Amino acid sequence: VSDTARKPNHQKKVVTVLEPEDEYTHEPDEAENYNESMYLNAFDAAQEVGGWFRLGNRVNEGYAEMTVCVYLPGGRVGFDYGRPHIDTNDKMEAGGLSIEVVEPFKHLKVRYEGKVCLLDEPGQMADPRTAFKENPWVECEVDLDYRGVSPMYGGKPQYEDGTELEVEAEKSFAKAHYEQHCAVTGTIRVGEETIDMDGLGLRDKSWGPRYWQALSWYRWLPMTFSKDFAMMISIVGGKPGGMVLEGDEYHIIRDCNIESDWDEDTYQTAMRCSVTTDHDTYEVTGEVISLIPLRNRRQDPDGNELFTRITEAMTRFECRGEKGIGMSEYLDQIVDGTPVGPDVRGTRSHPRP
């Protein structure tokens, strides 16, 4: 037995590990809320169009979370969400959406064949039942190739001797997570409209127990300016994080601040970010182009209704005179009708679910 193995966990060194096989699915934990999810976004800055696609396998609960969101010209959004049945975690394919790893860390494919709800006013999705009922559904086809333009960021934290960190399933959001900026080519068709995509984006993957209520709030800003200048800025419960891509190297964000503007629904409309790495400092401004509000609800063991709001906005960014595009994704738990994020400023309470 090594000296490291004899040490109590609190004295062991934690390292982050990422292997090519992590791009594929894992053997699920026993936790009921085990989640293995892949998310990919793509944007064309010149056209100010794009979208994001997510599959979250919850095989121990018997379903996948499947989301397709396409940002169209003029602020319109094509959107679908479903919980298709799954009984295996062997692949990322459900509800018409598939994510294929062609070559780990280098090349992935995203395909979707199905329908999306076409929203002229995406804010209607605050009441999804009504929005899905009152807006038209149109055919949608997605065929995109993602090729990495950056190193990998993140992985699975574990002790240096290879033993796993203990994760409390009820309070977990993920036990492993990584991200990568990508170049994206292909097509997105919504109804009679076709987007020829030659743009940039970011992808991520997580696995491990997840409840959407495990985090009280976060602000997540993935953005791209070019193939060799991009960022992911995050504040999770007050803790700064993320990275800046300069050339072919990631520089870890050591500190950041995000100051946001809000509308009467307490949805973000713009933001100003200060970012510090070991090498440089950056000032970034963002302006929301199109936003759709989403939610997740569940009951805790005591029967209390828990309500999570996630506002998903295609956002134009500017830094050092360079124009870029990406997302501003803001997650808040809603308590007594109010988002809990300490930065939220607005006038309207949200009705209890």
Predicted regions and their residues:
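Structured soluble/peripheral alpha/beta segments that form catalytic or ligand/cofactor-binding pockets
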Residues: S2-P353
